[in-house]
From Swiss-Prot:
Keyword presence, ATP-binding: no
Matches recorded under Gene3D superfamilies: Aldolase class I (3.20.20.70)
UniProt keyword list: 4Fe-4S, Iron, Iron-sulfur, Metal-binding, S-adenosyl-L-methionine
MF terms (GO), sorted A to Z: 4 iron, 4 sulfur cluster binding; catalytic activity; metal ion binding
4Fe-4S among keywords: yes
CDD domains assigned to the protein according to its UniProt record, in alphabetical order: Radical_SAM
Reported cofactor(s): [4Fe-4S] cluster
Cofactor note: Binds 1 [4Fe-4S] cluster. The cluster is coordinated with 3 cysteines and an exchangeable S-adenosyl-L-methionine.
Domain Radical SAM core: 11-236
Protein name: UPF0026 protein MJ1312
Amino acid sequence: MTIAFGPVPSRRLGKSLGINSIPCKFCSYDCVYCQVGRTINKTIERREFYSPEDIFKSVEERIGKLNNEKIDYLTFVADGEPTLDINLSKEVEMLRDFDIPIAIITNSSLIWREDVRNDILNFDLVSFKVDSVDEKIWREINRPHKDLVLDKILEGMIAFRDNYKGELITETMILGSIKYTEESIIKTAEFLKELNPNKCYLNTPIRPPSEKYIKPPKIEVITKILAIFNEIIGKNKIKLLGKFEGNEFIFSENVEEDILAITSVHPMREEVIKELLNKSNISFDIINKMVNEGKLIKLEYDGKVFYMKNIKSRDKNVSNP
């Protein structure tokens, strides 16, 4: 498979060249809103998935095709949880050759482990998932591996922050199907205040989630959570993410390969694909062909059409592990 993809426009990281370092779908969580689909292999065991040399080569080849296109970050964002990769530290060391800042987007679930904390200290930017610090809501949203303990994860985040010199951000997903109590919102905000990241991002689902019952929250729910976060953490630290990143995706000469690499982790809206293909003077027929060949699937969410690589985690027959 293609490990490096993009760059893709990111609402947090600018132009991000993605590194899909975990196959579909090894993860410690099975989040109800995950755009990659349901977790097939729920695990907390770290191991090698790809060799560091293969990851380096894939990034090197991808950068070589971009004609000096600006890249803001090399970002470990995968079909699963990137800290499951036991070679993270070596990979970051090798990727320093490109002189581009390196980021990781993690669900935070393994941060209680000292080896994981040490491995990600060398990233320029670390993004932690903190959907809720309320035990019941955490289990309902993130559906964690049976051996994970929320308190240990939260303690691990604080321990990491005490030693980290880079930029730390957090992301909190707000869902329409969750009954947030004021107490649960306050608890999460108070934890984030203690964690003291550079920025706390609030997000809502904008792409097809793994579970069809997941809907965007009502505006009054967003407003309430935003008000509590602003009061406890401070307005300067909080940012509510907008609807979509934009359409500044980068294609190489192999458009089909690029579409499959991007949509493996990042479902693309139909209108964005059409615009990108038009810029490259390529007919939309290529998308219809990929759907007919079973390479892509067509999804609908919140009144919009998306296309995604046909991966096993999106199979409706996949059950929760």
